[in-house]
């Protein structure tokens, strides 16, 4: 079966590898254009483009699936298109190009968390279980009938990066199985059933920690926005980046935002009980252990995060 693969970030690479390993004829890859990376802003291929070039697969670079891109896809006469985090909308004109349409691997148990940031929103919401689904792409946002699903436990220490990494590997197997079923004429997609929730793309402001909130909510938020866009707070009007924070339920006497140095640990008060800081990155500096950061403060006991 001739497959067009559409994807851009590193989490899509395991799916591309799985399809190649399973023996599918991946005729081309659709990915976002090369983007500037690092301080020197060097134009760099997407992780999917880089892997496709290693595998000798043709690469179509497009910021959007317009008429020209659709025509380029049609030249490859794909039987099916598999899409994993491509980063753009597939319009109606392109949906009908592959014989069997487009199959999307989405990192949630649809219809939960439709949208661009399902894993991040799931962690922030405090879900105990999430998963992945393959579904038939249609004009609505993640609304198409589902081919298959898998479940994944959300561990107490999981960041969005951790959970996405696991789902990218197990999801790759699910995607390969789905395409095999389609190829064998055995696929039977079912309408989505259940409560709908939405997962819009995270903004920088989603990473800001409000110390008036309960500790558990802050722990979940910090994990959900790690590695991107990252958790942060402010001190004297300057942004301070934070790695995920740990719960310290035995410490209940710290006012929200106030800090306390406890040996090598730095505690911060919240709306419920204290949390323990992970690494800290003050403005203009590198990430550092919290105790090192606290040693640079003139009067730590007077510091209050804003």
From Swiss-Prot:
Catalytic activity: L-methionyl-tRNA(fMet) + (6R)-10-formyltetrahydrofolate = N-formyl-L-methionyl-tRNA(fMet) + (6S)-5,6,7,8-tetrahydrofolate + H(+)
Superkingdom of the organism of origin: Bacteria
Record's keyword terms, sorted: Protein biosynthesis, Transferase
Cellular component, GO, one term: cytosol
Protein biosynthesis keyword on record: yes
Positions with a binding annotation for (6S)-5,6,7,8-tetrahydrofolate: 108-111
One Pfam family linked to the record: Formyl_trans_C
Major enzyme class: transferase
GO molecular function: methionyl-tRNA formyltransferase activity
EC number(s) on file: 2.1.2.9
Function in brief: Attaches a formyl group to the free amino group of methionyl-tRNA(fMet). The formyl group appears to play a dual role in the initiator identity of N-formylmethionyl-tRNA by promoting its recognition by IF2 and preventing the misappropriation of this tRNA by the elongation apparatus.
Stated family: Belongs to the Fmt family.
Name by which UniProt lists this protein: Methionyl-tRNA formyltransferase
Underlying gene: fmt
């Amino acid at each position: 079966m001739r497959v067009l693969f559409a994807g851009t970030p590193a989490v899509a690479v395991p799916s591309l590898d799985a399809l190649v390993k399973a023996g599918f004829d991946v005729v081309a890859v659709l990915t976002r254009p090369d983007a500037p990376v690092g301080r020197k802003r060097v134009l760099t291929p997407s992780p999917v483009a880089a892997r496709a070039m290693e595998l000798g697969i043709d690469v179509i670079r497009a910021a959007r699936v317009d008429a020209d891109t659709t025509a380029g896809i049609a030249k490859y006469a794909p039987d099916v298109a598999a899409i994993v985090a491509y980063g753009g909308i597939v319009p109606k004109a392109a949906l009908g190009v592959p014989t069997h349409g487009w199959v999307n691997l989405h990192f949630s148990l649809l219809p939960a968390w439709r949208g661009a940031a399902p894993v991040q929103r799931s962690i922030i919401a405090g879900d105990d279980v999430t998963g992945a689904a393959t579904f038939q792409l249609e004009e609505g946002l993640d609304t198409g009938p589902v081919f298959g699903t898998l479940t994944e436990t959300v561990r107490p220490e999981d960041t969005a990066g951790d959970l996405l990494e696991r789902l990218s590997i197990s999801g790759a197997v699910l995607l390969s199985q789905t395409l095999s079923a389609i190829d064998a004429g055995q696929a039977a997609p079912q309408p989505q059933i259940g409560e709908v929730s939405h997962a819009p793309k995270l903004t920088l402001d989603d990473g800001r920690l409000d110390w008036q909130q309960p500790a558990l909510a802050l722990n979940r938020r910090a994990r959900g926005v790690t590695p991107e866009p990252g958790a942060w707070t402010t001190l004297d009007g300057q942004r301070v980046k934070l790695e995920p924070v740990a719960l310290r339920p035995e410490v209940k006497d710290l006012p929200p935002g106030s800090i306390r140095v406890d040996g090598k640990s730095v505690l911060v008060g919240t709306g419920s009980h204290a949390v323990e800081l992970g690494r800290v990155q003050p403005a203009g500096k590198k990430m550092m252990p919290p105790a090192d950061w606290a040693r640079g403060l003139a009067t730590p006991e007077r510091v209050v995060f804003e």
